[in-house]
Amino acid sequence: IDYDRHMYDGYNWTYINLPVEDIKPLAIASIKDSTAMYFSCDVAKFLDSKKGTLDLRNYDYESLMGTTFGMDKKQRIQTFASGSSHAMTLVGVDLDEKGMPKKWLIENSWGATSGYKGFLIMTDDWFDEYMFRLVVEKKYVPQNILDILRQKPTLLPAWDPMFAEDK
């Protein structure tokens, strides 16, 4: 993304766009090795800040409004209905008996009075819908994915819908 950097004359970030099912094992490996990760998401969607949960079942908007909300993640991004709005630190995961994630633990920057002592719990299906960016150390990434970084990146304009909300 053009101008997506945090210092004058710095480098733009380089992203690898992966399916969420390929991202989760990288995050799990990092957490199992006690390595936290930069994580960005659309934090306001289905957030219960008092309970400290990010869960698609927190609010029943469909019954309240008498309609369904049928857009998938791609459609929400393309119409600017969803985007990366807040960065936090991904620090934990709760796995089921098959090693699949059920929920994730995030350390937030809003202080100890927000969420549960400054932490949020995000369900795995919320992760699928509203996680946008995860920075994982290269040692957790398979070589076939790292090889993608050798390709010439496509520079997207600053107004690209993928990161238009990212401020």
Locate each region found by the language model:
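Active-site signature of cysteine proteases
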Residues: 1-167
